[in-house]
């Protein structure tokens, strides 16, 4: 009898202890990544700002189709349809093993937030701004890659190189095909809410075979009145200005960069789809800038994608960029770019690819010294050649590679 009573007490106590343990929400963490290595040929390569001394080059180039990376992402169910989310992503040179950013462990992405299907998503940290998030489905980089296929120098920020620090971002739930998003990146400059800040907004409509988006962004230099790009500027590439290329080298000292873009796409059937974009980009001077007139670049582009079989993808793209006459330039620069891509899927995660690109530049632009240095415009394919443009008006590039996603 005593033994039976003791057993009963043990069961009761055990049940009480179990009942007193809080019910923790379900959570998950996923490790993911991309390793991409290729062999690339470039017909002319020189240092940024040079218009002579270019030579052809063949080299191993990582991240030609997609930047090599690894990351962690996950979430926790908070109840009521709300989840906490986070993402940490680090870039790397898969040819050498070196980190993409020497001063940032998770230089690609580092944010945390909450999401709810009825109320939308709010995130805080280093991330892509709303401008890119909603325009990216119609970006040329989807099928002809940013390395070769971004509009010259990624002039309009439609590739993934533009990330902003200290960003607060809200994206609405999709309602009747419509999504709205806005982001603000705090510059953190004492005495100013404007210096170094980045703010963007975008609207997207996607329903059935049709997709459309429009976006605007304003990137402010943290250096008052323009000048050398301040380290406190929220939109940075390892602490330096993003997207400096042969197109924009003479406008690095801008007080602000302003972008407006429209993109759209149409899916004809399972084999064919097309996307198109237009952008207006302005480099706005300040009292300390090395140029005096706003530099404006208008770009239009189109990409046709064909999938004849499950394992094959082919794409062709064309873009035209033209600068306005300003800062003493009467023959303004223009850039025509042609792209082809071929992708063969070995599996859902692994593929082989080939890429070809040609760009032709015409007219004049500013050199490193700004308005005091008018030079011939030189070619700079996509954004993979921002630091190694051609020394002449034309440039051809060809790449072969393998990519694996995990």
Predicted regions and their residues:
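Gram-negative outer-membrane beta-barrel proteins
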Residues: 39-47, 92-98, 130-134, 188-192, ...
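Outer-membrane beta-barrel "beta-signal"
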Residues: 346, 392-406
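Bacterial N-terminal signal peptides that target proteins for export
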Residues: 1-11
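Outer-membrane beta-barrel domain signature
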Residues: 57-61, 95-102, 155-158, 188-192, ...
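Detector for outer-membrane/organellar transmembrane beta-barrel domains
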Residues: 202-345, 356-358, 393
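N-terminal signal peptide c-region/cleavage motif recognized by signal peptidases
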Residues: 20-22
